[in-house]
Swiss-Prot record:
Name of the protein in question: Hemagglutinin-esterase-fusion glycoprotein
Region (Fusion domain-2): 353-638
Residues in the signal sequence: 1
GO molecular function, one term: host cell surface receptor binding
Function in brief: Binds to the N-acetyl-9-O-acetylneuraminic acid residues on the cell surface, bringing about the attachment of the virus particle to the cell. Plays a major role in the determination of host range restriction and virulence. Class I viral fusion protein. Responsible for penetration of the virus into the cell cytoplasm by mediating the fusion of the membrane of the endocytosed virus particle with the endosomal membrane. Low pH in endosomes induce an irreversible conformational change in HEF2, releasing the fusion hydrophobic peptide. Several trimers are required to form a competent fusion pore.
EC number, UniProt record: 3.1.1.53
Active-site residues, as the UniProt record annotates them: 58 (nucleophile), 353 (charge relay system), 356 (charge relay system)
Family recorded in the similarity comment: Belongs to the influenza type C/coronaviruses hemagglutinin-esterase family.
Positions of the UniProt region annotated as Fusion domain-1: 2-27
Extracellular side of membrane: 2-617
Reaction(s) the record says it catalyses: N-acetyl-9-O-acetylneuraminate + H2O = N-acetylneuraminate + acetate + H(+); N-acetyl-4-O-acetylneuraminate + H2O = N-acetylneuraminate + acetate + H(+)
BP GO annotations: fusion of virus membrane with host endosome membrane; fusion of virus membrane with host plasma membrane; symbiont entry into host cell; virion attachment to host cell
Sequence intervals crossing the membrane: 618-638
Length: 642
């Protein structure tokens, strides 16, 4: 009889890289980073498709006869907008003659505003004021501020009011021989023979607690009044000074102008200018007192429920070629905390006409069709990686990646993996070992780690005996990683406390502080991932060792009396009794069917943070199955000795 010795052959060479882990090491033919850097996409997006609403005009109006060529959004996104061609929130607030008057109202956690262009210099609205841009800026700023604190908002287009009997509604030549719907202009006829100066006007209006189905906790009201250069310009008959003042129910002045105590401008001119201040007022009854000749009466408001903090996105709204625009929307958003501004980089070039259907704007708003993990001033991200190459500019909400250098992200083994025995003394040793301490044993094992992300933790052995990770080992591993993470976070908190001392009212200092805090978070997370990587490598190593032990046991069982295991991973076989086909059956069975080993694991690592939080709070969670694939033997290298 001719006896030969068949062993599993060691296959490591200089092309392999060594990966040290907690509880075991690996040699691997390849390696990859635990996460890749992501790049934000420019433009707007939302965190949740079911909780946002838009307010727009013809560029989001699905009922426009030229839709979809006239639109800057998809049909799906247009359904989310409250829009009417020719409309704008400010037009509906003031109601200038001949302009679209649309009842804007709706509810959403995230509000997207793409409107404003219909009240711009091109509209040439006068009504005692040729340039309304500063009023528009103040109006839009207040809208964005209140919208960010409310779930629902609505135009209230008819306030209850009481006006004095001696006044009548009036029109103005410089307002298309009409006047604004809000404020309404009332005048008092003065009979010089009886009463030269007339009577002081006293009027009342009520801000409701509810308008239709919309609750009103706060109203945005336009407090409008005339500005005169001098008393003589106001009243050439020598009557008293001009005043128009709003009082709350307690008699406190909340808005207006009183030239009895405030000086006139002192400029030269004989035509008054109308000024409108934006007031945030609670529901209730208010009084208006004015000098006899004119009364400007609030008739409308925007109502907000103030029920929850939310997100606001404002989209730059400008005309195309040949029409003059303003940039009040841009300036209002930039001066409102938490408002994200979407801006074009090129002139507006429409498809339907010069002013409707711009390709760049369509690209910037295409993200509204999707849900993002993070939205920011820098753009939106829907990839799961926690890292981006550049710092995302605030405001930002959701699970936002942190800035990191690619080389700082830990690498994990990939491709062909070879385990070493490791040093975790709490791991049960296989009854029949095919490896010695720090030896390399291989049956050409291949493990695939699929999806973007990392394979994860092996949380325990399926066998009560044999190799693998014991409960005690896993507990000790997680105790170690937990302690190390707490140390990292404690160090981060100490650094943040030191930075707190540097906070000032200077905006740049606050921005610098925010950046430093994010950098500290990024460094802490990278440290945490380093610990996770070490535990991951160790547990994969132990799992592979168990797989090899199972392979050796399977070979011994298949061989029966035909082969005798003389040492770990080596068998003596009688060549005359077991020919080549017999040996192939024993040693090469895996070419037709892989050896069942470790099942898929629930081990995906994800970053957790509170939605709508400025920045990302760091927390690690093990979530859905990611698929450390079952180990399949791809081939056994056999060495034979006689």
């Amino acid at each position: 009889a001719e006896k030969i010795k068949i062993c599993l052959q060691k296959q490591a060479n200089s092309s392999f890289s060594l990966h040290n882990g907690f509880g075991g090491n690996l040699y691997a033919t390849e390696e990859k980073r635990m996460f890749e850097l992501v790049k934000p996409k420019a433009g707007a997006s939302v965190l949740n498709q079911s909780t946002w609403i838009g307010f727009g005009d013809s560029r989001t109006d699905k009922s426009n006869s030229a839709f979809p060529r006239s639109a800057d959004v998809s049909a799906k996104t247009a359904d989310k907008f409250r829009s009417l061609s020719g409309g704008s929130l400010m037009l509906s607030m003031f109601g200038p003659p001949g302009k679209v008057d649309y009842l804007y109202q709706g509810c959403g956690k995230h509000k997207v505003f793409y409107e404003g262009v219909n009240w711009s210099p091109h509209a040439a609205i006068d009504c005692y004021r040729k340039n309304w841009t500063d009023i528009k800026l103040n109006f839009q700023k207040n809208i964005y501020e209140l919208a960010s604190q409310s779930h629902c908002m609505s135009l209230v287009n008819a306030l209850d009011k009481t006006i004095p009997l001696q006044v009548t509604a009036e029109v103005a030549k410089n307002c298309n021989n009409s006047f604004l719907k809000n404020p309404a202009l009332y005048t008092q006829e003065v009979n010089p023979s009886k009463q030269i100066c007339g009577e002081e006007n006293l009027a009342f209006f009520t801000l409701p607690t509810q308008f239709g189905t919309y609750e009103c906790k706060l109203h945005l009201v336009a407090s409008c009044y005339f500005i005169y250069d001098s008393k003589e310009v106001y009243n050439k008959r020598g009557c008293d000074n001009y005043f128009q003042v709003i009082y709350d129910s307690s008699g406190k002045v909340v808005g207006g102008l009183d030239n009895r105590v405030s000086p006139y401008t002192g400029n030269t001119g004989d035509t008054p200018t109308m000024q409108c201040d934006m007031l945030q007022l609670k529901p209730g009854r208010y009084s208006v007192r004015s000098s006899p000749r004119f009364l400007l009466m609030p008739e409308r408001s925007y109502c907000f429920d103030m029920k929850e903090k939310g997100l606001v996105t404002a989209v730059q709204s400008v005309w195309g070629k040949g029409r003059k625009s303003d940039y009040a929307v841009d300036q209002a958003c930039l001066s409102t905390p938490g408002c994200m501004l979407i801006q074009k980089q090129k002139p507006y070039i429409g498809e339907a006409d010069d002013h409707h259907g711009d390709q760049e704007m369509r690209e910037l708003l295409s993200g509204l069709d999707y849900e993002a993990r993070c939205i920011s001033q820098s753009g939106w991200v829907n990839e799961t990686s926690p890292f981006t190459e550049e710092y995302l500019l605030p405001p930002k909400f959701g699970r936002c990646p942190l800035a990191a250098k690619e080389e700082s992200i830990p690498k994990i083994p990939d491709g062909l993996l070879i385990p070493t025995s490791g040093t975790d003394t709490t791991v049960t040793k296989p009854k029949s070992r095919i490896f010695g301490n720090d030896d390399l044993i291989i049956g050409l094992l291949f493990v695939a780690i699929v999806e973007t992300g990392i394979g994860g933790y092996l949380l325990g052995s399926r066998k009560e005996s044999g190799g693998g990770v014991t409960k005690e080992s896993a507990e000790k591993g997680f105790e170690k990683i937990g302690n190390d993470i707490q140390i990292l976070r404690s160090s981060t908190n100490i650094a943040i406390e030191k930075l707190n001392d540097r906070i000032t009212h200077d905006e740049q200092a606050i921005r610098d502080l925010t950046l430093e805090i994010e950098n500290a978070r990024s460094e802490a997370l990278l440290g945490e991932l380093g610990i996770i990587r070490a535990l991951l490598v160790g547990n994969i190593s132990i799992g592979l060792q168990e797989s090899l032990w199972e392979l050796a046991s399977e070979i011994t069982n298949r061989a029966g009396d035909l082969a005798v295991e003389v040492s770990p991973g080596c068998w003596i076989i009688d060549n005359n009794i077991c020919d080549q086909s017999c040996q192939n059956f024993i040693f090469k069975f895996n070419e037709t069917a892989p050896v069942p080993t470790i099942p898929p694991l629930d081990t995906k690592i994800d970053l957790q943070s509170d939605p709508f939080y400025w920045g990302s709070s760091l927390g690690l969670a093990i979530t859905t199955p990611i698929s450390l694939a079952a180990l399949a033997i791809s081939g056994i290298a056999i060495c034979r000795t006689k």
